[in-house]
Each structure stands twice: as C-alpha cells, then as structure tokens.
Amino acid sequence: MKDMYLLGDEGIDAWNYTKDSNNSIAGVSDTDEFRSLMEAFQIMGFSPDEQISILRVIAAVLHIGNIHVVPERRGSEDARLMNPNQAEKLCHVLGIPLDGFVKGLLKPRVRAGREWVNQSRTAEQVKHSLDALAKGLYERGFGRLVEMVNNKLDTKGDGDSFIGVLDIAGFEIFEVYLSNIVADPIAHDLPKLLVQQL
C-alpha cells in the first residue's frame, strides 16, 4: 500500500506536516491501529475503491506538505519548485497531469480585463496555495468520510443513527458568537441605564 501512494518507509518524521507533532503514544502500535482501521472499513462495508479514495487523500496531503518552493533565482520573486520530484509523486497519487498542476501552481491563468494572462507567483504565495490545497483536501476528505460512515450507519434511512464531529476551533468561534449576541444588547442598553441613574 505504501508503494501505491509513494510513501516509502521513511516514517512519520519524513513528512513536513507531521514531523513536529507528538506522534508517539506509549503502548500504542501504529501498525496495529492501521490494521484495525482497515478491518473497520471492511466491517462497515466500505468498498475497495472507497478505501483507496480515503487513503489517497491522506497520502496527497502528506505529499503536498513536502513540496518546497523557492525563488527562481537570486533577486527574483518568481517561484519555482525546489524538487519537482515531490510534485510528481503528488500528481501520480492524485492521477493528475504534472505539467498542468505546476503551471496552475506557479503561473496560474487569471483574467486581466478581457484577456487571460499567466500571473507569476512568489514562493510565499505558492506555499500559501499549497497549504490551502492540503487543508481543503483534508477537510473535504474528512467530511466525505463522515458522510460515508453515516450512510453506512443509517440503514433504515430515518437518520436515527449517525456520528457527529465537533470542530473545536469552530466551537470556540460559536462560543464567541453567543457571547457577542448576549453582550450586544447589554452594550447597547448600558449607556441608557447609566444616563437614567444619573
């Protein structure tokens, strides 16, 4: 399976998105956990194609994180891939043409008035685009996984069986939103109350 997604045997420290994380839990075997995951896919009735698509997204995110972008040359702001091999791996995993991906990444076509032109991008802009792509792929892939699990659980079609996911960052934003709803009327009415007290 590692060969299929061009992951190699380097381990978790070989991937920029995971190498700085606390990736070891005492008493937990990653190999055993992966076997359990694959067994759970089987039990839930995930087809081989569904399993492949889930794992493909994870592999793609890892490969995106390892694409390094640098200025084309000294004094130039135009970006280039430091090692095109990593982009080749990503494109292979996703089944997309390398040339189109690289052009779209480094010099995307944008509309300028009535014409289309290729816009040069800086290394920072390209890195931002890569991170956004990884985040978008992961978010959609995870959302699709939850949807697939819910479809497998909801055998009666009544929506009684499902899993829900709490997005902590989103929940914190929701908490701030609720605080603002409560605070806004108070902030609006407080000056009136103070004037009445005087």
Locate the predicted segments by residue:
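N-terminal switch/interaction subdomains of large nucleotide-dependent motors and GTPases
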Residues: 1-198
